Amino acid sequence: MSDSKNLNQERQKALDSAISQIEKAFGRGAIMKLKQGAIEKIDSISTGSIALDTALGIGGFPKGRIVEIFGPESSGKTTLALHVIAESQKKGGNCAFIDAEHALDIMYARKLGVNTGDLIVSQPDTGEQALHIVEYLVCSGAIDVIVVDSVAALTPRAEIEGDMGDQHMGLQARLLSHALRKLTSIVSKANCVLIFINQIRMKIGVVYGNPETTTGGNALKFYSSVRLDIRKVSAIKDKDVIIGNQTKVKVVKNKVAPPFKQVDFDIMYNEGISKVGEIIDMGVKLNIIEKAGSYYSYNSVRLGQGKENAKSYLKANCDTAHEIEQKIRSILASDNEVSCFNAEVNDNLHEVEETVF
C-alpha cells in the first residue's frame, strides 16, 4: 500500500515538474487543470430566433467558435447571418461582412435591423485576400461577429489569373484547410464568432445515401463547432401573393450542446425572421397560447382566425406580444436551469463513484 502511495507521489511530482517547465516555456495559462476554473459558461450571441437559440442549447452562436450555415439557394442563409449581426450590434458589438459573392443588399440588411453605417464590409477579389482580411480583423480583438459569404465564392488567386478552362484540382480545399488551421486558435482568443455561409453541391455517381455535399472540402466540417442546415419548406401566402417562406433549420453539428435538434420559423420578405410568428408557434407548444381549430387566443382574448391574422394582432398589440415572449423565455430559462442542475448532479455522482471505488 505504501509502495503504491509513494509511486503516486513520484508521478505527481513528475507531472508538476512537467507543467512548470511548460509554463516557463510558453507562459502561465498555457496548461492547467480544469478544476482551476479555466472552463466557464460559454458566451453566446443570439440568432434573432427564440426557437433556434433554444435548439443551440446556450442561447445562440457560441463566442470564440467557428459556425457554418449551409443550404440550397434562397433558403435564408444570409438572412440568418444578418440577424446575428443585428443582435450583436444591439449589444454594442462590432461586426464585419466579407462579401465574397459581391451580392450584399444594404437596404435589405437595414430592414433586418442591421446598423449598416457601423457595419464593416469588404468585397475581396480573391479567396486569399478574403481570408487575410478575416485574419487581420480577428487578430485586432475588436470584432464580435465576422460573416464570410460565401465559401463557394472564395476563389483562389491561381484560378482567377488562369484561363477559363484550366483545371485546378483541390485548390480551394487546400486554401481553406490552411486558413482554418491558423484561424481556429486566434478566433478562440479573440472571443468572436466567425460565420461561414456555404452552398450545396451534388456528388456525381451516388446511388445510395445523400448525394449532397458542401463546397470547400472537409476542413470546415471539422473545424466548425456548430453547423446549421437551413431549408425552405413551403411558401407563405396572403391570398394568392407569396409573402414569405416557412423555414426549417437542423443543428447537424454542435460541440457545445446536444446536436440534431430541429426548429421551424417564418422568414417574411422585407422583414426577415418573423418574431411574432415564433411567439405564436412557441406559445402554442408551451400552452401559453390556446389554439382551437384555426382560432388563436390568449387569456380568453381571441388573437385571430389563422396564423397570419394572429400575427397581425400581435404586431398591433406590442404589449401583449412582449408579455407572451417574456413567459416563453421564462419557461425556457427554467428548463435550461433544470438541465444544468441535472448535469451538475451527474458530475457529482461520478466524483463520488470515483472516490468510493
Swiss-Prot record:
It comes from the Bacteria. GO terms for biological process: DNA recombination; DNA repair; SOS response. Its main location: cytoplasm. One of its GO terms (cellular component) is cytosol. SMART domains: AAA. Keywords: ATP-binding, Cytoplasm, DNA damage, DNA recombination, DNA repair, DNA-binding, Nucleotide-binding, SOS response. GO terms for molecular function: ATP binding; ATP hydrolysis activity; ATP-dependent DNA damage sensor activity; damaged DNA binding; single-stranded DNA binding. Belongs to the RecA family. This is Protein RecA.
